[in-house]
A protein has these predicted regions:
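N-proximal short alpha-helices
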Residues: 12, 16, 82-87, 128
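A hydrophobic, small-residue-rich beta->alpha segment in the mid-to-C-terminal subdomain
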Residues: 92-131
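A general structural signal for well-ordered secondary-structure junctions
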Residues: 36-37, 49-52, 123
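Cysteine/selenocysteine-centered motifs that mediate thiol-based redox chemistry or coordinate metal-sulfur cofactors
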Residues: 20, 24, 47, 119-162
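Generic alpha-helical scaffold signal
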Residues: 33, 82-84, 104-107
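Structured beta-strand/loop patches that form or line metal/cofactor-binding pockets in enzymes
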Residues: 42-92, 97-98
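Charge-rich, low-complexity N-terminal segments
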Residues: 1-47
Length: 162
């Protein structure tokens, strides 16, 4: 399976975008949104577990979130969000980065580890880890959309004098 097939975002990339960068952005976003329990489960299946060292231990901080009115208007500061970040280096010398919303140090650490592993072996870990996690996220998003759609109210306006 090629990267273009394994990571659907590659096909949407502009000509100026590096496909490897687009793939990495995609899997990093999937890892950041994944459930910690799913990442832990996959980590337990790796035998032997890869050796690594922390370049930056998991640490908690804040970031400003920006929004746009209507999704297209002028940007404005929406508010701050708690982030946890981590940087690891695998024995092969590959650096992995993990950024997650919230305060889960372990989630950021596992995200960084899997980022490093994906840089080395994306053909191995992409279908086994990234694709199932992405499908789970899509299913959760669809469920939330259906629940919200069930509460939607349609207002009709009546024309006077008809």
């Amino acid at each position: 399976m090629t990267k273009a097939n394994a990571f659907s975002r590659t096909a949407d990339a502009s000509p100026d975008t590096n496909p490897d960068q687009t793939d990495r952005q995609f899997w990093m976003s999937v890892l950041a949104r994944a459930d910690l329990s799913d990442l832990e489960s996959y980590w337990q299946t790796l035998s032997p577990a890869p050796e690594y060292r922390h370049l930056r231990k998991p640490e908690i901080g804040m970031a400003m979130v920006r929004g746009r009115a209507g999704g297209t208007g002028s940007p404005f500061n929406l508010g701050e969000v708690t982030l946890t970040r981590c940087v690891v280096e695998l024995d092969a010398g590959v650096q992995g980065f993990g950024y997650v919303t919230g305060r889960s140090r372990r989630h950021a650490e596992l995200s960084a580890l899997f980022d490093g592993l994906m840089q080395q072996h994306s053909a191995l870990h992409g279908p086994a880890l990234i694709q199932p996690l992405h499908q789970q996220w899509l299913a959760r998003r669809e469920q939330v959309s259906r629940k919200a759609a069930a509460t939607k109210v349609n207002f009709m306006t009546m024309v006077r004098g008809s």
